[in-house]
Amino acid sequence: NSFVLDLTQDDWPRGSTLRKNRFPEKHLAEHGVLDWRFVGAGEWELAFDAFAQVEGRSWIGAKTDGRDAKFTRTGHGRFWRGAARDPILAGMMSAALLTIKGVPSAFSFDLDCGPTRYAIANSYDPAVARHSPGKLLAYRNLVHARGAGIRMVDWGAGDSGYKQTLGAVQGPALRDWLLVRPGVPAALARLLKGRWAASGQE
């Protein structure tokens, strides 16, 4: 299932939560000056470079071949840089970035469609993971989103614990469908159906 957050709730975010966030934020600041910023129009090329730096130090850079990274040159960086050159798509993009002593340390990247925000990617530098930089940035990003008129955030599926901590609840079910042409392709698909099911990717 997907996870969604209704930003129109009167009791979100709770004051107690924001007060609790001050403790890890204080310790995070021990690593250097914190700069929380929101990416503006015309800043995407530099922003994607900053996101790529974070991804390079994150688990996806350390424990995988990096091909699934969203913003690196060896990942999907070319796609997003190309998309940002389209003024309509660029106008839908939204992002928040945390730098510590000038070094990119966490980011959140989303697409806005009317009053709904769709989360695309987020990551953080594991060197400061114990102080929850990603969660702290997420709260700031969500508060900023509500102020900008966003009413609902859709995080998609996966990582339910993190999303529920931020206040998300289960949303619509997500299903992947593979459509094939009638005839030979359909017959071949039927033959491979059992192998596909056994792979656990249903």
Regions found by a protein language model. Name each.
Residues 1-12, 148-202:
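Active-site/acyl-donor-binding loops of N-acyltransferases
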Residues 63-66, 80, 126, 138-139, ...:
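Short, surface-exposed, polar/charged, turn-prone segments marking secondary-structure boundaries
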Residues 52-53, 97, 121-122, 127, ...:
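General N-terminal targeting signals
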Residues 1-130:
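A conserved beta-strand-loop-helix scaffold within acyl/acetyltransferase catalytic domains
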Residues 25-27, 58-61, 120, 127-132, ...:
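Short, surface-exposed linear patches
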Residues 13-20, 41-45, 76-81, 136-139, ...:
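Noncatalytic linker/hinge segments flanking ATPase motor cores
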